[in-house]
Amino acid sequence: MHFSVRLSLFLTLASSLPLVSAVPQHEDQAYTFSSSGRSATTDTDPALDVRQETLRTPSAWTRLRDSLVESVWGLPQRSEGCESRPRNRAKTVSRAPATLQARYGEDVVLRFTIKNQEEVKALVEASNILFLDVWGSHDDWVDIRLSRDVIPSLLGLLPPSLQTSHVPLIRDLAQTIYESYPKAGSAPPSQQGPTTRRFSPSASTSKSKPHEAKNIFFQDYQPLSVLLPWMRLLVSMFSSHTTLISVGTTAEGRDIPALRVGVHPTNNAQQAPRRRTIVISGGTHAREWISVSTVSYIAYSFITGYGKSKSITKLLEQFDYVFIPTVNPDGYAYTFSTDRLWRKNRQQTSLSFCPGIDLDHSWGYEWDGNATRSNPCSESYAGDQPFEAVEAREIASWARNEVTVNNVHFVAFVDLHSYSQQILYPYGHSCAHLPANLENLEELGAGLAKAIRKSSRENYDVKAACRGIVASCTGDKDADEPVTSSALERTAGSALDWFFHDLDVRFSYQIKLRDRGSYGFLLPREHIVPTGKEIYRAMVAMGKFLVSPHVLEEDIDGLRASEEPQDYDNDLEDGEDDKDEQDSTVFRAQADDLQS
């Protein structure tokens, strides 16, 4: 617009300014003025008049004037000086609701540093006396959750060396739990009002990078109501090599869903040979959300990698993989709806107010429930007899049926847990019994740890499960029976030992995932994809070892120590990134169709 026209408009506006006060205001906003210029209601605070004037809705004329000025001269550009800088505002953090405060408000998590066998024994005895929730442990530390008012009682039962060797790991447990819930609902539905959440790949913005599209599901922890439709969607899209199966029914009547992934020969002229099968499970303990997400990530990577990754294609031609994201659907659902730190299943016990059996202590081999038989309230309650836990009994029955009826040969079993970053092999019930293939277990375990380290530079320790709790705390690492016979976390009656001994699965492992830091079971969502990637790499390494054991060391040693951590896309052939992007687009489109 020409300058003379702008000047003319400006003069017109300027001449009209005295008329602004004459423009009628809304009756609710009318003001009367005294001769002094003050409001007629002189008994009010002058500052209140200023605030009221500031908050008044602009008149029609004022809005017209402002819009005309902006259309002619545009909005003023902020200078780069100090006045243009945004004000520093305190970051607002939503506080945990009252229901969470009531349940966890007085709880903390303490980390005790342990140095010798005597300290371990003292901590074991004290935790049993006070019925404490032992979160996790490693070679030189143990994490315990307890109420603040119980701390003096605990310290009173410990030797002086332990009374000063602890630090708070989580100071505000209620707030930390609140922040761990998915962003779409930062607390369980019972604590935040009704919400509707479902899997929606199309929810990503159009600006998302192509390789990010496939990780939409893994941007947060997903409840059971999202996990199940996601599994069905994968099967509908990749039906050539993926099947949705049920490996049992829970105590509350839910299916235990699993994905069977593999490419079977099409020639049925001869009877198919025994199908070698690898089982990867998670979610045995309900609160270990990262294990559920990691199994899902590995399943997704194998399913979508077929035909694009030479390694994955070969493995799926050689093996069937059975992915069980959550062995404990009832407990997992309960952690989203009611109690984030629930560990056991939801089965009724002899005490109606203490439901639940620890699924990883309920298996039949070397079951030892005598220590907790009289206390169903214990976090490690193993039931009154072997296989009393419904889910453990159902999965064991499914596995036996696969072997005897469906001509399946289980060659590996991997049970994912959290936390402490350990790769554990049999036996867990006792260090006095050594596996016949101990050397092979150690070799493959070391290979898995090396694959993880090359992928993400994270260190995972490899050891027998019986030593996985306090291996260096016995004073003698070569002792036949370290202080785990009455350990902080009992390992008798585990799925690890049952699959290895009773089902003769020669390569059985329990992997405790991230981290070793300050999060415990409340690992932030930002760790979902990195954890999934590193364990995916380990599972690829396991498959290669089972195909040809000598390949594993060559494969891993071929990676230079200076290499950057590898990404899934690096395993694709040239030109397949575009195909992956197309698959992601189709995946989102079909997801929308499925929901509609």
Swiss-Prot record:
Name of the protein in question: Inactive metallocarboxypeptidase ECM14
Residues where Zn(2+) binds: 285, 288, 417
The organism's place on the tree of life at top rank: Eukaryota
Cofactor requirement: Zn(2+)
Keyword entries, A-Z: Cell wall biogenesis/degradation, Disulfide bond, Glycoprotein, Metal-binding, Secreted, Signal, Vacuole, Zinc
Binding site for substrate: 285-288, 343, 360-361, 418-419
Every Peptidase M14 domain range: 220-546
Endoplasmic reticulum is among the record's keywords: no
